[in-house]
Every structure is written in structure tokens, then in C-alpha cells.
Amino acid sequence: MKKYKAGIINVTGYAGLELARILESHPSVELCSVTGRSLAGKKLSDVFPYLHRLDLPITENLEGQVDVAFLALPHKEGAALVPALLEKGMRVIDISADFRLKDPALYQAWYGFEHPCPGLLEEAVYGLPELKRKDIAGARLVANPGCYPTSAILGLVPAFKSDLIEPSAIIDAKSGLSGSGRTPTVKTIFCEADEDVCAYSIGTHRHQPEIAQELCRASGGVIPRVTFCPHLVPMSRGILSTAYARLKQPVTDEEVKEIYRQFYKDEPFVKVTAEPPHTRYTRGTNMCFIYPVVDALNEQLIVISCIDNLVKGAAGQAVQNMNIMLGLAETEGLEAMATLP
């Protein structure tokens, strides 16, 4: 059986390493090339012993035949590489934010750089399979969604599409420390992060325009007001988002739950739960657990959603997108359930 060839540009970050872990056991795809400038010349399994079956050399550039290239570089660093990869006939999945926003001006405003290839922004497909499956299937370039937006959008989009709520939402999200990457900072070292919870980038987080853009599309072009407040919590993985939105008209708790169940009934990686979910339910999996509830006294909808920020929020969703692009079963390589404890 022919296997597709995959390559990872910048395997050494958390998202790149998680991609390597998932792809190693993928039945239809072979990970054949990985890059990492600071570790070029070393073997992946030597530097990261937990990836003991991956004896791949880490190189400066992708080598050999590659059908699908995953970019796991920080924002701004990978965008300029994409045209050359596409010219070589590769399908490209970018895990950074470089192709998520459609308006080039937003990159200057929110990310502080002028986009090097704005002509590709319209072509790039926003890779949230639950909303864009058909577009992803025919795409050359997929912009993998951010971790916070994945959790927030999946939690709110059924309510927006069903016209249940006013075009406004408050999103309170809490993330494990891996969401800040592998490079240590004062905020993320153990002595500072342990037994501590803090809010950050209040009203200025770069995922805010991404959430607003996709909720606008889901609501038929109505631009929503999105208030987004992220927090760091002392755990390694996981995001739990709690979204609040005003109901347009009275609706029962069961009616809302049924709307959500019907919306996601055919989705392999979204489960509407009977009780508020825990982040540990998603650890190491590509699942998103969602719990909608009506606050009847205040005429509010409250939606809790949680994901593993490195899997459904990054590498797992990227593999899900790859499966769709290659015409494979969407769940291939992503069937793992969480571990407990």
C-alpha cells in the first residue's frame, strides 16, 4: 500500500513534536523529513528519546519527496516559505497564524509585520473541519486554526448559526502552559507558574480577530463583538473556554442542548456532554467536549468547551486537515482516547 510522504518544518517546538508523535503511527502517511535549524545534524530520537521509533535526521531543509508539508514555525517566520513549497507541488498546512486572517492589514495591526504574500490569504482555507470540510478537501494551503479559536468557535458557532444569540460574546479561556511554547519565560517557569493563575493580553490577544472573523462568517456576515480574556493555569496541556452570550428569545436548556447535539451529530471529534467537561477528558486526543447551558434568570447562554491545545488545538487538527486533503478517513491516526489519571 502506497504511503503519502509528510515533512515537518521546525519539528522542535511543542506543535512540531506532537505532529511527529501522531504521524509516526499514521497508517497511510510516512513522516520522511523533519527540520530544525538549531538541532540540524542530530537524530530526532536522540534529542527527544520519547520519540524512540523516529530515527530521522533533523535537517536544515526538507529533503526527498514530500507530499504534505507542515509548517510549525512561529508566526511571521514561515509565510515567505509557502510559495516555493506550493510550486513544488506540496500541499501545505501552516500551524502558525500567518494565513488565518483574510485582511492583510490585520497582520500589521495585531502581529506587527507586513504580510510577505498577501495574495495567498484569500486562497488559504481556514482549517476548521467541522465548518470547512469541503473547502479543505480541495485546498493547496490550509491555515490551521489557533488553539483558543478552535475551542471558542466550536463552542459558539451552533448558537450563531441557529440565530439563538445576539451578535456579541464574552469568552473567558484558560490554557495550560504549553500554549506559550517551549521557550521559557518568567511567567512559564515552574516557580512562577505553579499554584498561580493569571490573565494576560486582555483585549489585545492575537486570537481575538481570528475568533471574530470566523464567527462573522458563521453568522452570515454580521460582525460580532468579541470580548476575549485568556488566562494561564498551572497545567501542561488543555484549554477550557467559557463563553457567555445574550439569548435573543427565551429557550429551554433542553432545546439548546438538542440544537448542539444535532449540529455536531456527525462529527467524530466533537461531543456534546451531559455535564460540564474536564480538560483531562481531552488530554492527548483530538476531541472537543462542549456543554451548553441556559441561564434563564439572566437570559444568557453559557457554553463550556475544552480541548487539548496541542492536539485539537494544533497538531491533531493539522492531521485531521491532512486526512481530508488526501481523501483519507478523517479519523486516521487520531483514534486515541485520553489517559487517566
Swiss-Prot record:
Q: Which GO terms describe its biological process?
A: L-arginine biosynthetic process
Show the active-site residues: 147
**UniProt family annotation:** Belongs to the NAGSA dehydrogenase family. Type 1 subfamily.
Identify the taxonomic lineage of the organism of origin. Answer: Bacteria, Bacillati, Chloroflexota, Dehalococcoidia, Dehalococcoidales
- Sorted UniProt keywords: Amino-acid biosynthesis, Arginine biosynthesis, Cytoplasm, NADP, Oxidoreductase
Pathway named in the protein's UniProt entry:
Amino-acid biosynthesis; L-arginine biosynthesis; N(2)-acetyl-L-ornithine from L-glutamate: step 3/4
User: What HAMAP family has UniProt attached to this entry?
Assistant: ArgC_type1 (MF_00150)
SUPFAM superfamilies, sorted: Glyceraldehyde-3-phosphate dehydrogenase-like, C-terminal domain, NAD(P)-binding Rossmann-fold domains
Give the EC number(s) listed in the UniProt record.
1.2.1.38
Q: Where this protein primarily resides, as one coarse class?
A: cytoplasm
Q: What are this entry's molecular-function GO terms?
A: N-acetyl-gamma-glutamyl-phosphate reductase activity; NAD binding; NADP+ binding
Which superkingdom?
Bacteria
Q: Where in the cell is it found?
A: Cytoplasm
> Which InterPro entries does this UniProt record tie to the protein?
AGPR_AS, AGPR_type-1, NAD(P)-bd_dom_sf, NAGSA_dehydrogenase, Semialdehyde_DH_NAD-bd
Gene designation: argC
Which is a Gene Ontology cellular component entry for this protein? cytoplasm
What is the purpose of this protein?
A: Catalyzes the NADPH-dependent reduction of N-acetyl-5-glutamyl phosphate to yield N-acetyl-L-glutamate 5-semialdehyde.
Protein name in the entry: N-acetyl-gamma-glutamyl-phosphate reductase
Q: Which CDD domains match?
A: AGPR_1_C, AGPR_1_N
Record has Signal as a keyword: no
Q: Pfam families from the entry?
A: Semialdhyde_dh, Semialdhyde_dhC_1
